[in-house]
Amino acid sequence: MHTQKAITEALQKLGVQSGDLLMVHASLKSIGPVEGGAETVVAALRSAVGPTGTVMGYASWDRSPYEETLNGARLDDNARRTWPPFDPATAGTYRGFGLLNQFLVQAPGARRSAHPDASMVAVGPLAETLTEPHELGHALGEGSPNERFVRLGGKALLLGAPLNSVTALHYAEAVADIPNKRWVTYEMPMPGRDGEVAWKTASDYDSNGILDCFAIEGKQDAVETIANAYVKLGRHREGVVGFAQCYLFDAQDIVTFGVTYLEKHFGTTPIVPAHEAIERSCEPSG
């Protein structure tokens, strides 16, 4: 049974330091049995960064109608009328991004951003700075909490989570100067007048596949491709927390690498020939 003290010490050994800004992507199952459960993991993370540090997570929303309204799809009138508007104070988190986020949201002093589908949660001195503002059309790119996390010198922690979980790399996708980026439109239910739902349309980069070759089902997306290439450089930290294999990345460094990678292989005048770029960048290795 893993204790808070043991998890905190393992995080520190991995390279988490007092004062860090830490975005956590976690698989609680991978960590193994923890005395006190997920709340203990949150406490260990906060202990590792100390009172001057901030812990952040990608919460999203368990009622996000992203898929139901994607690229012109439309909910029926009854669903649109009865769908709850997004309320950062009460909304659940998307379980696909890990159960830990629900416990971060419930932590004392937690702040949550107002973008329903790309909602971020943060706990610590930088919580308000990170989460506000967060407008539709700025999900994970410029003007988002994700951008502020990168610019403020954050670290991305994969706590048993796979390499396709590095949310910071979606910022690299957004700012990289490459043609033919995929765009999506979708609708989100926002609070309206007198408690009514106000449906708002958003247009943004496609974080599920920034280019066509990264949007093929069963293939690596850009985030996983870039993260795998970055790990080979050895500029990150690896270790074990509980039973979980962990990676710790400097967000600015991996984002800079990601932007360069995308522009090198997919820019207007790519250094790598197009057919080789597809082979090297869009196909899974091995």
Curated annotation (Swiss-Prot):
UniProt entry tagged with the keyword NADP: no
GO molecular function: aminoglycoside 3-N-acetyltransferase activity
Its EC number(s): 2.3.1.81
Keywords assigned: Acyltransferase, Antibiotic resistance, Plasmid, Transferase
Listed InterPro entries: Amioglycoside_AcTrfase, Antibiotic_NAT-like
Cysteines paired by S-S bonds: none
Biological process (GO), any one: response to antibiotic
Reaction catalysis annotation: a 2-deoxystreptamine antibiotic + acetyl-CoA = an N(3)-acetyl-2-deoxystreptamine antibiotic + CoA + H(+)
Function summary: Resistance to antibiotics containing the 2-deoxy-streptamine ring including gentamicin, kanamycin, tobramycin, neomycin and apramycin.
Family the UniProt entry places it in: Belongs to the antibiotic N-acetyltransferase family.
Cross-referenced NCBIfam families: AAC_3, AAC_3_II
Record protein name field: Aminoglycoside N(3)-acetyltransferase III
UniProt organism field: Salmonella sp
Underlying gene: aacC3
